[in-house]
Amino acid sequence: MPLFDYFRAPDADAVRQALDAGGGATPVGAVFDGIEAKGVDPSVVLAMMVAAVRQVPWSADLVDDRLVWPVGVEQDPEYDGPWVSELNTSARDVLAGAGDLPRVAREWARIEELGGNVDVADAQVFVESVVDLARRAREADEPLFCWISL
């Protein structure tokens, strides 16, 4: 299962420097404030959390991301990771402004992509950690990033 770590950082340049210095290893914990999120990809599973917060159906544009590291691999079909993407600030701000986290966790725990049977208490702990990270990022005026490894 692919690994996804979400973190906040001052900007994409700081992320590139940290990943270059660390050989591509996750910067979560060692360099940047973040959380581990095995199996929670930005464009589908995290976007479904954003949809639950907004109380709207999932759509592909709820979480936009752009590759920031490594530079130049967008067209390389042989490259198999890791990667880092920067998430759009609107997704960060929706998550940072989330209320009624028990409702969000109940809805999100039932999504098909998580198997539809995640324990709601576990889902709530994870939702709270994502929301807290988004709030810290917004407070610091920093973007959210996602480190991805296959």
Where are these regions (language model features)?
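Acidic (Asp/Glu-rich) sequence patches and key acidic residues
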Residues: 1-132, 136-140, 149-150
